[in-house]
Amino acid sequence: LLTPEDPQHSRVTDSTEIKTTTCYMCACRCGIRVHLRDGEIRYIDGNPEHPLNQGVICAKGSSGIMKQKSPARLTRPLRRIAGRDRGESAFEEISWEEAFSLLEKRLAHIRATDPKRFALFTGRDQMQALTGLFARQFGTPNYAAHGGFCSVNMAAGMIYTIGGSFWEFGGPDLERAKLFVMLGTAEDHHSNPMKVALSKFKRSGGRFISINPIRTGYSAIADEWIPIRPGTDGALLLALIHELIRDDRIDHEFLKKFSNSPDLVCLDDSTEKGLFLRDPQREAVNEDLPQNKYAWDQVRNVPVQRETDQTEHFALTGEFVMPAGPHHGKRVVTAFELLRREVEACTPEWAGSITGISPSRIRLLAKELAHAAFEQAFELPIAWTDAWGGHHDAVIGRPVAFHAMRGLAAHSNGFQTVRALAILMSLLGTIDRPGGFRHKAPYPRQTPPRVRNVSDETQIKPNTPLGAAPLGFPARPEDLCVDANGQPIRLDKAFSWEHPLSAHGLMHNVITNAVHQDPYAIDTLMIFMANMAWNSTMNTTSIRALLNAKDAEGNFKIPFLVVCDAFDSEMVSFADLVLPDTTYLERHDCMSILDRPISEFDGPVDAVRVPIVPPQGECKPFQEVLIELASRLKFPAFTTADGGRKFKDYPDFIVHYETAPGSGIGFLSGWRGPNGDQSLRGEPNPKQWEMYASNNCVHHYEMPIEHHYMRNWNRGYMKFAKEMGLRQKEDPIQIAIYSEILQHFRQSASGQRPGRQPPDHLRSRVATYFNPLPFWYAPLEYGATALADYPLNAVTQRPMAMYHSWDSQNAWLRQIHSHNYLFINPITAKNAGIEDGGWLWVESQWGKVRCMGRTSEAVEPGTVWTWNAIGKSDGAWHLQSGADEARKGFLLNHLISEELPLEGTGRISNSDPITGQAGWYDVRVRIRPAAGDEPEITYPQSHTPSTTAATSAPTELAYFAGSLK
């Protein structure tokens, strides 16, 4: 260590500086401090002044240095050499002007003729407000990010039920919880903040129960691990609901006032069957919360106006007959009564046979939940006023918290499973209450939000922005993106009768549909930061073949493929045009309230990235690429009235763009107004970037304490949210115990509803799965599988030290994970004749993989699992030939099918029939030992030649004292 007396001390300190920015090594987006000496990155640590991670940093975050030093960096635009196949990495370097001119000419022609022939799909990019705006201005509906492949079931299932969801838009209040139940969550989800919260929760005496097929990461520190079979969480949740209702351990007051539980549903066979009965003599007032519904007053024994503060006499259960009046003689039932009937048969014994959890443990868990919610309830002395004008002196705390993610979502039954979880939380009265689930801005929003997607071909016109958003939240069949014949308008078939509520699109079906020209042919597919030729796809083998598929004339079936990435991934080798992106330490970027911010429970939080070091070579941020293309193509939002360029570059766009002229709402919420003294709303501030940079690159607006809770119904908060542009209306957001939205689709399927109808071959599918109440069904793949031949479930999860496939080129993180194993319960391995550390075959009906196995008691016997995306194609990411990642690493993707047979009509996406969520946790497999004479190398093997632009970088790195050797 240098002492102040050392002559070198002043030189080192004078040349050392610290800059703050936002991490991008996973989706957590922690605040970081980057230490530089002589302009070179020396060290990265957590920023203790950042509200999200409070100085905590993980292995990924501190290893960002080696992201900069990656041998896989792309540094110049590349064009595939004419006559060479995709996948060969046969490129020639071109200038940015050549790249822009090529794209401008091609995209201008598409936009002027048929905008649908351009498709833009992105990975975990954290900039969907910009990419979505670009797609809408272009005029193409064919846009989405990776959510349909990731966790749309979690987002949609909860948003359609309670108006918010886990992760960016809400989470568990572990500061005040007494019991915490985590389901289906791996280490990558909300990583550092969750670790910080869990450590405090455990130290304060909280009880932590983890329900997961695998005991790793978070589960390892749980007080109790309850192993469960994959895809069966819904059955467990329904059994818990059954027990709580049977024992009358529910929050009656909360359900009557803040949910649609007491609302009366029509039972008669008519066009109103299954819908809430409405008074035709009263106005609806608004479509989100109709003011003309009924409840039943059990004291007076008459139907009464539903929307009132006087709810104590409302019946939660019961079936009634309407008296004289517009609905005389009609049979009605409360929504809660329908839920009670739905779960009546969902006993712990029923769930136990499905989940593998003993009935007694299910009963005990229900009692634990109720005990925490009611016996350990408390009050905070916070006065607030509800939406109906009622004054409350305190906020009630229900200290039982949940968290769940992809383990529930990535199944074809995930939407209804997540609905069941949201309803369980609601029965306990935990929604936006201390110790329970709490929203994060910009949520809560209506159920669903008032964002409607393209729903008609007339909204798509040449040289014209879309007439609606490319992505939205359908509320009726009329909101579907289908043509006059009921056929899909979008390439991925999102918002069609196949997957009506696909709020995040179906990125995983884009390549297959484009090659098969189903529903039509496209011209140009642009992919940003999505490794769809490897791990970010359902079946890697088939997709790699499809990317190279040609027609009878020898032309590629996807005529033009553009890939933007910072690194030489497997996907890059298939591109016709490669656009080299910057790293997160080389660019401006923002985590916007308009997109997926990093808000806290107490108020909106957004953040930025600022350049720490200059870009390498000729790298250019994809954000800049979009701004440049939008300006050249003269999109209305990017040009002045006389057709001139409106924004100089991406930073200028972020500062000056407003959602509507004069709205005062832009991408960043902090330091708005001419003097930078306004928050959330205000005129553009030319010095906004500088103000973020001087304030740790983060803006945290702390709301007054009276706005912290009960925000679905908190009059003060709702007024504030509307004024600040977080919501469109001030109406309360009632919890949808019963989803009338789902019933509208079911009515159409049964022919009871006028208007749009599903194609005949999909009627039964829609009628079955669009149950307005949650129910459990086996994953769809099970119906196409001989389960006795494939008795095991196979799943993946991300390790703490790696994210997607981004980190195998990171010299530090490779030392933690250079290859992966298949983890098998010792009993299962013994029965299959497989030794610990031995080579084995994993087979599904769709494919097979040879890999190494390890026995582990931290996995339930019916499941095998591995780390996601550790395996690599030989040569990709500029790893040396024969690297462990290629020779010993493997993917389970080779075992998964993108499509399933659909009776009598061909094939359909292997996805949730409601949301289109990829069902990549549904695959069934069998295992057997590899023969002794087989090569000890994983199968299948593939080769990805390194691009010419990356081959000059060294493959063996030693980083010390600012040097790279």
PLM feature segments, named:
Residues V610-I612, Q616, F622-G676, G751-R753, ...:
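Long, contiguous, secondary-structure-rich segments that constitute the structural scaffold
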Residues L1-G318, H327, R331-V332, S358, ...:
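N-terminal export/assembly segments and adjacent metallocofactor-ligating motifs
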Residues T131-I209, A235, T317-P323, A335, ...:
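Extended redox/cofactor-interaction regions of prokaryotic respiratory oxidoreductases
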